[in-house]
């Protein structure tokens, strides 16, 4: 599954600046076993002439959105969704993001943001696919997150 979009900010429409934000989101799901899924997500976020506060943020579980930004951000994440009971699944995931552009580079470890985590899900309504999801994720430099959501992360 792919999603590509562009958000155009224009002074002529009442904005303070002219710039674009382009996002590309690619997802792939592989079913295996009884109710298990291996999921992948590759996300890209590009800005053009954007003010600093609008630059591309790291978007991985384990990091607060907006804490780490760059002109561009790319990430890849893999997740195993394992059904261990009729209404229960667990997730194990890992990923890495990179901010780049300007003085930032994916070859510099300070611009790389790894994440790892796990969670448990309860399937509230199996036919409708409604899932209650509790996950914990670790990032670098003491970053972490606890997430309680309806549905899977992606």
Predicted regions and their residues:
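C-terminal outer-membrane beta-barrel translocator/porin domains of Gram-negative envelope proteins
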Residues: 1-102
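Residue-level signature of outer-membrane beta-barrel architecture
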Residues: 28-30, 80-82, 122-124, 138, ...
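Small/polar, glycine/serine/threonine/aspartate-rich low-complexity segments that form flexible
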Residues: 101-112
